[in-house]
Curated annotation (Swiss-Prot):
UniProt-listed Enzyme Commission number(s): 2.4.1.18
Pathway: Glycan biosynthesis; glycogen biosynthesis
Gene Ontology cellular component list: cytosol
Catalytic activity: Transfers a segment of a (1->4)-alpha-D-glucan chain to a primary hydroxy group in a similar glucan chain
SUPFAM superfamilies: (Trans)glycosidases (SSF51445), E set domains (SSF81296), Glycosyl hydrolase domain (SSF51011)
Compositionally biased residues, Low complexity: 778-789, 810-820
Subunit structure as annotated in this protein's UniProt entry: Monomer.
Domain of life: Bacteria
Name the UniProt record assigns to this protein: 1,4-alpha-glucan branching enzyme GlgB
Amino acid sequence: MTTFVTQDTINAFFDGRHADPFAVLGMHETDNGIEIRALLPDAGRVVVIDKETQDEVCELSRIDERGFFAGIMPQRNSFFNYQLQVSWGNEVLRIEDPYRFHPMIQELDNWLLAEGSHLRPYEVLGAHFMECDHVSGVNFRLWAPNAKRVSVVGDFNYWDGRRHPMRFHQASGVWELFIPKVALGDLYKFELLDNNNRLRLKSDPYAFAAQLRPDTASQISVLPEIQEMTAARRKANQLDQPISIYEVHLGSWRRNLANNFWLNYDEIADELIPYVKEMGFTHIELLPISEFPFDGSWGYQPIGLYAPTSRFGSPEGFKRFVDKAHAAGINVILDWVPGHFPSDTHGLATFDGTALYEHADPKEGYHQDWNTLIYNYGRHEVKNYLSGNALYWVERFGLDGIRVDAVASMIYRDYSRRDGEWIPNQYGGRENLEAIEFLKHTNYILGTEHPGVMCVAEESTAFAGVTLPPENGGLGFNFKWNMGWMNDTLSYMKLDPIYRQYNHSKLTFGMLYQYSENFVLPLSHDEVVHGKCSLLDKMPGDTWQKFANLRAYYGYMWAYPGKKLLFMGNEFAQGREWNYQESLDWYLLDEFHGGGWHSGVQRLVKDLNKTYQKQSALYQLDTKPEGFEWLVVDDAQNSVFVFERRNAKGEPLIVVSNFTPVPRENYRFGVNVAGSYEEILNTDADIYKGSGLNNGGVIDSEEIESHGKTQSISITVPPLATVYFKLKSARKVASPRKVTKKKTTADGAEATAKNASASKATKVSTKKTVKSSEAKPVKAATKSSVTKVATKKSTDKPTAKATRTKKATVTKTAKASAKTTAKKTKDNA
């Protein structure tokens, strides 16, 4: 027979060098009739079958012994639907010829992909089930503009790159091939021939599923349906709502006790979600679950951005996990990593032989801290790949938000680099303008396509406008992690209480920038790894002090303006650092192993969450200055802080923190509203394994000036504790009489100096007028239980502080000079 295919062309196919298979294979018009050509390595016989009549049309001639067939049908002068009946040894199969199908990609999609402005590129690129000419199969598409040849390889073609070379669309750089009869779950990759004639075997960047490491193939999976966000979930993400986030690493929250292996998505959902609900958290934040090759990266070095990791099951299993969380009223946030990717050969690195996804120059494209590659945000197709991925997770799995990892490393070209190791931007500056534009664009897309979605930035610098809308010059995030607050407060809490008075500003400085952004207060996984110790072990002192410090810190954090985030295990004060290879130490909650200390902290966190949600003053005005006021900010000597939180109606809630192991009795401070105040939470309570020192009953304000207020209350502040007071009932006050204001010290604390006669009169008065800074501090600092009896109020105030006789476990202090006083106090008791 006569064919118009040269031997050089045939050799190019078998050598894997031919770049345009559709120009040769399939059905073609010739002067002599319709010709069909087929590349079927190792086939013995090929017959053309008319699909409509099921008649044999002709047998193709084997032009090349390796398996190239061709045949001309003079009786046919127009295209028709056909199948190929192929004999391989003793096996005869009827197959669809992939090269008889027309291009599937729409002109608009092709144009948008070329422009890098496709809203949902994942709907076009990757592997998608579809039907063409009544034939079902999978359409494969890959962006690889600099490759000489791209083939699909997989279970269905013996991983032979000669069998399914793809069609190239020059305008967009996209390769395409529809392969009939490919099944759900089939494994596949793309084989690329680069410009240096090197073969590269790559996973699909847009794959919806992937193999479990160490295997690296992509897996045919179904694209989930779009999920609409409900009004309730949208409301739960708002600035004026209580947001308490439980950060979770799915691989180590809890494991199979028999073999220490991971639980699957369904098993995790059945245990984790009821626990989170019971603990009172409103959101779950998952460490990255996009497929990643190295367990030790915790997911922060992903390769398959569109594939939920197969460590815990299928994409459908992850979808069920999210659905179960929503059914329980819990929103789900995903840690998302668009800042860098690993250099594994099956991934994005030098994808088509060129720096396609990354920068070619290591000064721009190599991350020195993590030995990873940095995305080229200036390339539209790369920006499209990443923005589309954020949208994919939100709308296809119904996620309620994303937390963007390592934003600072993205927006600064000199991040973690010395002089000479980075390239300035076009204006000579250090900002990565392309990355900034990418973040603005992504946040804008998410906000417009799915209003109410929460976008959170882990940004560790003072970059301005992180949570401003893009139209106002900001990055467009809804929240930013307050890394400054976290570092300052943990630095303060690590100190021995005797030294905290010299570092008082570490807890007050945050208010200077509190309202510059919308903040989340993060106690994340980063603070309990790499030798940093657990939160519990960061605390100074003996066992009692460590737990008391941590409880006081949590109480302070939950009352401070900003949404809350706590990494798993910290809710029960796990004693060791987090280990991603093991389950959390749940046994510590057992009374025998944990002595009640850990269960006490767990109970406190549960109560903090419930109090937080119940008291709108603690969250409603987080981002507004009118929601917060320092009542005592300058008592560095006693390491006491007092502030007031308010809701939109102006209703107050007062928070008192004592960061020394010394109880403060008769501690007086001014209040804004006259009335009765009730202690509603005390981190030193018995049920939390505290000493039990409290302010039993209701405390009435008195017309005694303190801290610039005409009304004040006098309380007992437990050692190493935070106490919340709620206004139970307001009281009208007669027209204020003139009150002589006392002098203050240079640092703002109220002066203690009085003349001798005035001091004596104060001591014998039935109505106590002693201010916090005037009260004699209790010097006791022993491990023994010391009975603290508060001074009883006069009979005209029967409801206030009826008694304070609870035993308080008062711990030792580092002050050597306090030992003598402590002994005397113990003896007197």
